[in-house]
Regions:
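Hot-dog-fold acyl-thioester-processing enzymes
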Residues: 1-54, 111-125
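HotDog/MaoC-like acyl-thioester-processing domains
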Residues: 2-10, 64-66, 77-125
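Short, well-ordered turn and helix-capping elements at secondary-structure junctions
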Residues: 16-18, 55-62, 92-94
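Hydrophobic beta-strand-centered segment that forms part of the acyl-chain substrate-binding groove
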Residues: 38-73, 77-79, 83-85, 101-106
């Protein structure tokens, strides 16, 4: 599916506070944005509390600059009995143009919890 046909879970602009000591956007900030997007997706999909239990295969294939707009797209990789494995793709668009590039990607696993904080089954959709 093309990026144009997908809807981002999160869209945000990188600000000066989001930079590393070298002036580029901090990879930890990018990973955090992917985690937030996946958390939102997981809570909606499980209809309740879902917590992050693993972050795997994190890659930073590109760099982004302050002022660039970041869109995070989330896809379901696998739904288990109590967990979801999600793939996040973070794409940056130049502030004053239309050029886009993948700047981060990774897989995030969430577990659905009940009111007592115990894993609970999630419905199949």
């Amino acid at each position: 599916m093309s990026v144009a046909a997908r809807v981002p879970v999160i869209r945000v602009t990188a600000m000066p506070a989001d930079t590393n000591p070298y002036g580029g956007v901090f990879g930890g900030w990018l990973m955090g944005q992917m985690g937030l997007a996946c958390g939102s997706f997981a809570s909606r999909r499980t209809h309740g509390k879902a917590i992050l239990v693993a972050a795997d295969a994190i890659k930073f294939p590109g760099a982004m600059a302050v002022g660039d707009e970041l869109s995070v797209y989330v896809d379901l990789v696998k739904a288990g009995r109590t967990s979801l494995k999600l793939k996040a793709e973070a794409i940056a668009r130049e502030r004053d143009g239309e050029d886009e590039k993948v700047v981060a990607e990774g897989e995030f696993t969430f577990v659905a919890l009940d009111e007592q904080g115990k894993p609970r089954e999630i419905g199949r959709e």
